[in-house]
Amino acid sequence: VKAWKEKVVIPTYEVGKPEKNPIFLEKRVYQGSSGVVYPYPVIESMSDEKVDKEYDAIFIENEYIKVMILPELGGRVQMAYDKIKQRHFIYYNHVIKPALVGLAGPWISGGIEFNWPQHHRPSTYMPVDTAVEENADGSVTVWVNEMERMFHQKGMAGFTLRPGHAFLEIKGVLYY
């Protein structure tokens, strides 16, 4: 199993600038959430023009599958490819085109995203911290994590790829 960092270019519709002042509860109730996002900045606009944007990706690969993780976009699994059947096994969106449906604005479809403390977390379109572990059994784990600012919880997702296995193991860890 190998892991590496690589710059990738993905056509992207850029988001607008965040509101300069914090937005407190203003009846922005969304799918059962309170609507509160403070202290996160809210973005309420996006570009209609597509540009090629460079992202720092982390790849993990074995003889069966290849996975791309995007730390700059919330640590989501953007792409997972079955090398034997020669097809993606999760929805792979080749363009980053946010919709303003997330708690703090931008949210993108495709891949696998992780949400804590609630769905479409406010930071789903923000960078997260990462660490890569090479395990004794030859497997590799990529950890993505953040200290969530609303409730001060640390959330982590670990993606492990093992030699000789055709699946991605995912482990979630929450500290509160």
Features from the language model and the residues they span:
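Asparagine-centered strand-capping/turn motif at beta-strand->loop junctions
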Residues: 173-176
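Acidic-aromatic substrate-binding/catalytic surfaces of carbohydrate-active enzymes
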Residues: 2-37, 57-61, 65-127
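Extended, loop-rich substrate-binding clefts of extracytoplasmic carbohydrate-active enzymes
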Residues: 24-52, 57-61, 109-167
